Amino acid sequence: MTNLSERILAFERKLQVHMHEVFCPTHLSIGQEHVAEEMAAEMIKEDWLFSTHRNHHHYLAKGGDEQKLWDEIMGLESGLNGGFAGSQGITDRSINFHASAIVGGLIGVAAGAAFSLRNSKSNAISISCIGDAASEQGVFWEVLNFAVLYNLPLCIIMENNGKSVDAHISERQVGEISPKVAAFGVKTFQSIGEAIRFTRDNRLPSFVEVKVKLKCAHLNMATMLDLCDQSEPTS
C-alpha cells in the first residue's frame, strides 16, 4: 500500500469514527484505494476529472486539499464549497475536479470537456469516473457514440463493485459491460494506466472496467445512525 492509499484509507476510517457528526449523505471508498493510486500515477494537473457520489479517493488522487475536503463534509464554511456541497457534490476548480450525486450525471459534462480539448494544443484529457450502475443510464451509451464519432480525448473509468446499492448486477443487467462498450468502437483496457495513456497519446476515447470490492456500507451518515437508534419497537 502506497502513501496515497494509506492517506485515503486513514481519511475514510477517520470519517467512520466521526460519522455521528456528518449530516450529509456520505459514500466512503474503503477498498477502492488502488483505483486512486493507479489514476494518480498517470494524471496531470491540467486533466479534467469528473467523479461520482463516491468521490473522496478520486479527489485526493487528483491532488486535492484533504483538510478542505474534511471541512466540506463537516459542513464548515472553511470547506471546499463553503459547506454547501457536502460529500457528494464537491467542486475544486483549482485542480479541474467536479463531482455529482446523480448516477451518470457528469458523463455528458465530461464529454463536453473532452470536446473542448479535442483541438487544443494541451496534453490534457477528460476523465470520467463512474460506477457500474451508470451503464444503466441512457446518457452513458449516447456519450460512447458521441466520443467515437468526434474522436474525443475521453477516458472512462468504471469501478464495478457489482452492486447498485444492494441490488446485484446480475439482477439488473444481461451480459458483461466491456464487450458492449467495445461494440461502439471504443478501445477497452484492463489497466487504468494503459487507458489513460492511450487517450493522452492518441486523443481518442478509452474505457476501463475495474472490478472492485467495497469494504464498507453503501451509504454512511449520522441521520441513518439516529434512525437506527430511534427505531420503533416491532411489537
Where do the language-model regions lie?
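Glycine/aspartate-rich loop-and-adjacent alpha/beta segment that forms the canonical ThDP
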Residues: 198-235
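Short, proline-centered helix/strand-breaking motifs
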Residues: 149-158, 185-187
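Cofactor-binding active-site loop characterized by glycine-rich and histidine/acidic residues
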Residues: 16, 21-150, 168-183
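Structured core elements
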Residues: 27, 188, 207-209
